């Protein structure tokens, strides 16, 4: 036992002794306990001298360690010194009270027994008896039957008896023999009579006097006791419902039992039942030893005016056990007569009133049953048949048929209700007919639905109407049907019950050991189906399968515990009375029914005694900690082994004392083996964590177990020592590992050495340690203590290097900034892991030391700031740091008087504080953390593990196969592992739980309005659920976060239903929508609440379900593999890794890729999206591991905390873990906002959203996802939303929505920039993209500042500060080129404003203006692209012509459509100013809908808006004004919160720390505003203020770093664009070649067919041309006649169709459209030429214009041009252009066009023969 535990026990013992001494005579005063808990006191003993017929008494001083045997030996000498010489008697010591006596066990401690009289201030005596003495013959016969002689020598004189005397003697012997047999049958009664006889003799011969008693003043003591009992009862009355009239006194008469006592008055409440009144009355009458079930209370009604003693005309009715006497007495009308209550023995033939309806007039024998009992007799309640509910709160009964057992073994169903079927008719319906009826509500339930009849041992069900839906085993019935045990009974559509008849089950259980009717359905685990319940009357009933026999399953039926545990609770129990306890349990078990629930462990283990050592050695010595699936398997196996040794199954032949010694020996052997294993593996961190977890869990099991705790005190001490020893070894291992990487803190960034350790190595070590502890399920309290040691080690190592090595130069501004920056990574990691308090506490000295090195310390005004900031540094440490300080070349020196003043202040503050705490003032930090090791009080696995944990069976399988042991599951166990724990009143717990469920409820809950002031968040955890009969979802309070606004208000409680928030109804809303509404509220929120709505709607069990954390623990524990991240976060990239420049991308193959889930699994996984996602240890999934999402019923009740938001992150696993144990993670509780509900379903086709899950090669959670959305963490105090930023957010979102159609940039949306809570927090985030700013925290800024120390990629996620803005994510890997085959060296010009979709004219003008401003930047690139286009134009024209009919559906494309080989993801980031800075710090993160993510784009204008090379003066001015307003608002907010905190009288430590940080932030903001104001007033004025210089220096450094980062990102972007363009060009060329080949084939076929038709027409045309030749020679030749005639029906195209855009290319449509708008002449457009007379004159239309007058010149030439028109029409169908295209012109026409400078070179080639024919015609 630890020192703390022993001190606590000693304190409790001292309190008990103090109470004894206060009430007892001084003679019997007991001394105070020693360190070993030993005490002494005087005791009075009596000796019964049978020979003398009297009692002797003596007082001796006894020790608490003296046993009964020791005392007997002493008393034998004291009372009769010559006894031992004359005989060898057997003595016993008895504890005697007025009500009886008890013999003490030989090993009991008499002084401890006497001290236990304290409980009720009892009085008693100790009597020594000689067991060999016969009962004194006080009536021995001498000379006749009437004659008596004095006892003595003469009593042995014998005489001859007469015949009559012999006959009488024989008769008396027979009577004595009969009485002896009766005594054997009723041992308790016999014992009671013997006890009463001895007690009567003792108190008769030695009456109560001041000499014989121990109590100093009995009257005062008893009065005080009565007063205390009265006050306790009155307090119970007040606590029930607050009414003063809920309790009172009641007279109980007992004329038949104690005729000499008129009555006793007992204190009752109006809800106390008759059975309670019986127990209280028996105690009042001194009959507490009697069995209350043998007695009853009868109400006797006397006529008005009659006396109590007058029984004439009295009518007596026996009260049932559940009737309330005081309530009956109060409601009794006085005109009916006088009502009195009599305590009397219960008649043997008594039948409760509820059973009399169908028994009166019938034979009481009833129908004979197999067990010999009939229903006609008075059955105990536990033998009555009953209905147990299978689907409480479900909408349909299918929940029963497909119930699911979760990974932790819990059932998907809630706690069942149970209804006993009395010997009568039980009505079922919505109406309450009487106390016996079953009232149900729900669809399909009629007012009088059906009747259940229990008569003559048969139970039947009869529907009352045809509309009453009643099903038996799934079949609907309409007439009376007999029920058999195990049948399913359904009423309506939502109530399913199982009918159980214990008597039938008992018969079947005799035939088969395990032949029960099991519930149908998948049996995932033994013990999963739990149907145990407790009725209001206190009876325990079972609704599970049939019982197995005691010989196989009740391993612990005779478990060892103290006798009458209720009477001895809270007493001193150094030794347990095993034999009496087992005798008591044997008597008790005779009265219990075998079908009751077995209150035993979920499983037990059996092993042979011969293989005990091998079994224990296999469990402890040969267990490989790295391969165990369930890490606590040894603990649970060893605990089951201990319980097995204590049970009667293990060697039933041994005595209880031997069994106790055996259990002690087994536990000692376990502990000894465990000690050896820890010693052997003291250098292996994984094994140490494993055994530390198991040792602490086993110690908790043994300490809490009510039987083991008192017999294994030595083993408990050793186990506690083992936990501490393993802890010490593990700390040493981890500190040794850390020591190797500690030089990383002193790594000079200017000396970039690859061999030296980096800060990432330290973080990797810490993360490996955390992962190890969580996998091993180490208690959270031990985890915090261990990391406190590691943080102290870091603090000690660095601080001692600073103060002890003055020549190293570390005491300088430069190194102070470096160390402080590195410590920032540790702090950020600790905050992410929930260890921020431990880190803040144990790193405080080195943090304050680095702060001192970097802060101002040059003038006396700095002294108060130094002392207030460095308050933990003592005078020696401050002096060493300041005296050893190395100033930079241009840094002022520290004045000596300043050092002296600072040291003097520290001597009066820090030094005095240390001395008052008993610590020495020393320079160096102590290597050992001066904190005691504390064993956790709670937080152990047994509180949450239910049934048999997953992995335990696998752990035992090898041992079972070798015959070492056997695991026996107990299917009827309640499923808890705390069943044997001290104070685990499991029965009353379940009884109380079901009593609450069975209470009739009011029709509607109370509606109240609550107004909360949100300071640190609303502080509620909500859950969405639908109650029975409800049509819509409701939002219920799952829990109230301690310290939140709701907790402070006090009116909200778990189970309340939230009806509306700020007037907006929450009824019918989904959980995530409700959470969104609740977070989008102002600082004052008004809630409409239905008090305890969950209970009114049948959702009371919802409140008992484990929180998400517990669920996750169970999930993770159940499967042994890390749970996959919630689907809601699959769209989010880990921006900390691939978004910031300090984290270069790793190859694709180094990222873990999740397995593709099947459809059902994916659906189940999606249903779990919105559950809280705990922040796990950032470790990769187990190799080959699959998450526990299997097809089955997923949990549909989810919890959201509106007071806590945390980020969900995942880290890549490229490097091995520091402490690999490849299974099992352990989670920590976080409340996380759920993702959008739209993520539960796939996007519709038109959404253009990629179906991630249908692309196995796409890694949905990797850093290559095309959509990067950063979810921002918020601590609870930062979860405030200000209305002033609401408009700004909507403006940004609107801007994004306007760009939805553009896909040039697919980037992050709704990124929220968080405000830092203190100035120092600005400097230590690895996410910062301004490295120079991290080292310019303070100081004049005129001396050297180190460059940024950027961490290299590690296997764990980088430390992420949640109070700093997140880095922008990378751009998408896929980037579709605007131009096929064109390498892009620089970004393209941005699209014009009208490309972005419908916008207002003002916004469009702004967009166009920005485009013009950036046009110059792009001129070179555009010119080069124009040249490329010109060169490629003809090739593009040919490709586009073939793709007219191949336009692809935009829906078929996705951002990842062409991502073929993403080996090198882009590291490009967009500038941080574009979107992130426009979302303000206190803004709530909105729920991202999937529709929001469809091609969210950022235009290139925005991309370059932060570029200093092309500033936008208008935008910059507007931005500066906005920033100024925001800064002012931040300062106002800070002032308001600071004022609120300062006004608080009692601030917590967290509030004080927050106030300090807010003050720093407020000062910083004020200085920043002042500096800006000065700059505006006078830009030329030199600002000498050091703080202003610091601020400007930092801002300038940020700007420079941002410019460098942007330039670097721009170059990376261009390089990636070129690579992707080359890939696209190669792919498109291949596609083009394939299409060209297909086109050539089609063209060849078509031209062949055309030529055949052409030859036939050619001859006819030639003849006509010959006929026209003469006429043509006579007519004057006009130029227009030399071209081929146009067809008769040809109409020139209008001007509006001039651009005639070609069809889109086979890339994304949006990309092509941008290309067209960006450069209208970039692609070839066919030119239509209408050559006529006006063309010859070069009219205003121009050569390329189209005139509508061409048709007028055609009509005169109909006949001679008929053939040519036919030819032209046939060619028009095939050529891409119209008939006016250049390829249709004659040679002369081409010559004419050529002479005019027009392009006629593009001509579709025909066959050689066709060309020759055409030339022949043209020349004629």
From Swiss-Prot:
Biased composition (Basic residues): 160-172
Biased composition (Acidic residues): 1576-1587
Protein name as catalogued: Afadin
Biased composition (Low complexity): 1309-1318
Its biological purpose: Belongs to an adhesion system, probably together with the E-cadherin-catenin system, which plays a role in the organization of homotypic, interneuronal and heterotypic cell-cell adherens junctions (AJs). Nectin- and actin-filament-binding protein that connects nectin to the actin cytoskeleton. May play a key role in the organization of epithelial structures of the embryonic ectoderm. Essential for the organization of adherens junctions.
Primary site of residence: other
Subunit composition and interactions: Homodimer. Interacts with F-actin, nectin and NECTIN3. Essential for the association of nectin and E-cadherin. Isoform 2/s-afadin does not interact with F-actin. Interacts with ZO-1 and occludin, but probably in an indirect manner. Interacts with RIT1, RIT2, NRXN1 and BCR. Interacts with ADAM10; the interaction locks ADAM10 at adherens junctions following ADAM10 recruitment to adherens junctions by TSPAN33.
Residues with the N6-acetyllysine modification: 1803
Compartments in which it is found: Cell junction, Adherens junction
Tissue: Isoform 1 is expressed only in a restricted set of epithelial structures during early embryogenesis.
Dilute domain boundaries: 653-908
Residue positions where Phosphothreonine is found in the record: 1232, 1330
Record's keyword terms, sorted: Acetylation, Cell adhesion, Cell junction, Coiled coil, Phosphoprotein, Repeat
Disulfide bonds: none
SMART domains with a match to the protein in the record: DIL (SM01132), FHA (SM00240), PDZ (SM00228), RA (SM00314)
InterPro entries: Afadin, CBD_Afadin, Dilute_dom, FHA_dom, PDZ, PDZ_sf, RA_dom, SMAD_FHA_dom_sf
Region (Disordered): 129-196, 356-377, 538-569, 1107-1194, 1203-1222, 1235-1278, 1308-1527, 1567-1716, 1734-1820
